[in-house]
């Protein structure tokens, strides 16, 4: 049975996640950042005979799912999702396979993309003076770059993306870095989420006209180095072999396999 979590359930959920929080990073970090009871997130547990089978955290148009044994009710999850404007489900690969295997595309068309979660503990120091923190005036260009990207952009609603980036930046939950040429942003990367001791780096993108010139490695190394110096664990998600190779060049090692379920109906689109 799925129950909505209350404030006094926080320690129960954290205990269930335990030290393997890298298997549900966004769920864990949003929980730490906002806390149960916040208007920003909704948190639920699937419980059976007083045992937790799964945890669900709703944030904007995403639901983050974590289950240790994938012994939860997909039918009940589907009913819960009907009450939320969900476009994506993020979870471990095995959980995505379990949900997808019990979710008919005739009910709601979807695609599943598999990838990896990786961590970096050390990065080679390189010359990267061109990397700088983004200014408020850069965000319009950043949103346009991300939304226009053939891989990254398809996971976002444009207005929601802009809202998330600005909100996270103002709250200190993320930092955006850019490389610019003549005041035009040609490369971007950010900490997509940060809490004490942990950060996720994400949204690495380079303008098509400037690709394969080393800018991706330059900005990726710079942001990783900056965050590692602060004593934080640094993680990243990726879904393509090209991105996988780039991460290995920088020094990332994989800690788990990942899955992203994207519903194809366009009711959320601009």
Regions found by a protein language model. Give the residues of each.
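Short amphipathic alpha-helix that is part of the acyltransferase structural core
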Residues: 1-26, 117-157, 269-270
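A conserved beta-strand-loop-helix scaffold within acyl/acetyltransferase catalytic domains
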Residues: 32, 58-60, 153-205
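Cytosolic beta-strand hydrophobic patch enriched in CBS
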Residues: 42-47, 176-180, 235
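Conserved donor-binding loop and adjoining core beta-sheet/short helix segment
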Residues: 1-2, 21, 29-84, 187-202
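Acyl-donor-binding surface of acyltransferase catalytic domains
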Residues: 59-128, 261-263
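Conserved beta-strand-loop-alpha-helix junction that forms the acyl-donor binding cleft
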Residues: 90-96, 235-248, 254, 260-267
């Amino acid at each position: 049975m799925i129950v909505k979590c209350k404030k006094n359930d926080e320690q129960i959920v954290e205990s269930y996640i335990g030290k393997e929080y890298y298997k549900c990073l966004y769920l864990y970090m949003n929980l730490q950042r906002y806390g149960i009871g916040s208007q920003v997130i909704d948190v639920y547990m699937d419980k059976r005979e007083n045992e937790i089978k799964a945890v669900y955290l709703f944030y904007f148009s995403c639901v983050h799912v974590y289950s240790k044994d994938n012994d939860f009710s997909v039918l009940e999850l589907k009913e819960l999702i009907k009450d939320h404007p969900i476009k994506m489900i993020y979870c471990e690969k095995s959980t995505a396979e379990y949900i997808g295997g019990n979710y008919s595309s005739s009910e709601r068309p979807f695609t599943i993309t598999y990838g990896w979660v990786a961590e970096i503990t050390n990065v080679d120091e390189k010359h990267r003076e061109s990397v700088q923190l983004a200014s408020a005036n850069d965000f319009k260009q950043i949103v346009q770059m991300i939304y226009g990207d053939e891989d990254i952009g398809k996971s976002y609603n444009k207005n929601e993306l802009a809202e998330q980036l600005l909100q996270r930046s103002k709250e200190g939950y993320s930092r955006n870095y850019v490389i610019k040429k003549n005041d035009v942003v040609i490369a971007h990367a950010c900490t997509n989420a940060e809490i004490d001791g942990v950060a996720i780096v994400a949204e690495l993108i380079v303008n098509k006209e400037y690709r394969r010139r080393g800018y991706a490695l330059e900005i990726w190394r710079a942001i990783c180095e900056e965050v590692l110096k602060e004593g934080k664990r640094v993680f990243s998600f990726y879904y393509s072999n090209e991105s996988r190779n780039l991460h290995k060049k920088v020094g990332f090692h994989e800690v788990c396999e990942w899955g992203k379920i994207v519903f194809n109906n366009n009711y959320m689109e601009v």
